[in-house]
A protein has these predicted regions:
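Secreted/periplasmic proteins
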Residues: 2-18, 23-121
Length: 121
């Protein structure tokens, strides 16, 4: 006798929420970079932005959190120091903006936007 497994929509929703709320889990995202035009400007954490440091802006991690960002078998560890990208871009699938130095460790700056995975270190 074969048994069919019936999954309730609420079960799927709960599973998705658990995965998304897991602070050490990873998520597929899009990333961009910001650089010279923000040099020296205050970030959301109160410090001044330096595009030469390995930092990132995100709404999804606390300030000071170290995250591993991976693209095409290359990874970089960055500290969350700012908030961004803008809410409109977050709604379009962009979850993190990298400093110029961090982005350059993953891809040529000319790409501008890359697919990444992000996980808490």
């Amino acid at each position: 006798m074969k048994h069919k497994m019936h999954v309730q929509p609420s079960t799927v929703t709960l599973a998705a929420l658990l995965i998304l709320s897991c602070p050490t889990c990873y998520a597929a995202d899009r990333a961009s970079w910001y650089g010279e035009n923000q040099r020296g400007l205050p970030m959301a954490n109160g410090q001044r932005f330096n595009p030469d440091k390995l930092t990132a802006a995100s709404w999804f991690f606390d300030f000071g959190t170290m995250v591993v960002v991976t693209h095409a078998n290359r990874s970089v560890v960055v500290e969350i120091t700012d908030r961004g990208p803008t809410k409109r871009l977050v709604n379009e699938g962009r979850k993190i903006d990298l400093s110029r130095a961090a982005f350059a460790k993953l891809a040529d700056l000319d790409f501008g936007l890359i697919d990444v995975t992000v996980r808490k270190q």
